[in-house]
């Protein structure tokens, strides 16, 4: 017989989600909904003076922040896809990932320095402070900027393009939320970054 649950609701401001916590009689948490959290980007950009391609995401996901590196969710296809494009084995460690990027003249960073977000949901992003991309653009010869997904592209166009005066090409997101795109379809579209 399943234990009965007790629901406790805490109401936030009208635009925020109501936090619902279900407790079993022994007070174990069963499930919760997400509420807004203010996140500040904690990773340095990956680049060197030989970088030619810049790939921008939005902001590290919850799993990425837990793993202390970009694209840290095990179902995100970024590292598997990039390895396939570079004709290498999929890197496992931060050092291997960084080394692969730099060997292939690829820089990565994100468009958001800080924002309010629910979990890892890009659609919930608000109150954005953008990153200063000149940190990269002034120190290497970036020939093309790519967005990993529509949200990264839209945020770049809104916040960074007026300052950089550089166009961005939007590629389909490698996020597990973009399940409509198989790894093969992503490979076909992303292959332009190494042309």
Where are these regions (language model features)?
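Charged/polar low-complexity intrinsically disordered segments
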Residues: 6, 15, 28-29
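Short hydrophobic targeting helices and cationic amphipathic motifs
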Residues: 10, 19, 27-28
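C-terminal capping/extension of enzyme domains
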Residues: 20, 33-52, 74, 121-134, ...
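Short, hydrophobic/glycine-enriched beta-strand segments
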Residues: 52-58
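Short, surface-exposed acidic-centric catalytic microdomains
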Residues: 63-124
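Internal catalytic-core helix/loop-beta-alpha segment
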Residues: 103-151
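Short, well-ordered alpha-helical microsegments
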Residues: 152-156
């Amino acid at each position: 017989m399943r234990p009965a649950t007790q629901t406790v609701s805490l109401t936030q401001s009208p635009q925020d989600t109501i936090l619902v916590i279900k407790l079993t009689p022994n007070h174990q948490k069963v499930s919760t909904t997400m509420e807004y959290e203010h996140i500040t980007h904690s990773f340095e950009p990956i680049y060197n003076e030989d970088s030619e391609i810049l790939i921008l995401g939005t902001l590290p996901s919850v799993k990425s922040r837990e793993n202390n590196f970009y694209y840290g969710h095990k179902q995100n296809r970024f590292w598997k896809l990039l390895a396939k494009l570079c004709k290498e084995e999929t890197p496992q460690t931060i050092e291997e990932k960084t080394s692969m990027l730099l060997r292939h003249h690829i820089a990565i960073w994100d468009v958001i320095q800080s924002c309010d977000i629910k979990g890892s949901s890009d659609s919930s992003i608000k109150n954005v402070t953008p990153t200063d991309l000149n940190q990269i653009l002034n120190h290497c010869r970036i020939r093309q900027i790519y967005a990993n997904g529509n949200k990264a592209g839209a945020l770049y166009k809104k916040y960074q393009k007026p300052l950089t005066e550089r166009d961005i090409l939007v590629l389909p997101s490698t996020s597990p939320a973009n399940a409509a795109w198989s790894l093969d379809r992503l490979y076909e579209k992303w292959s332009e970054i190494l042309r």
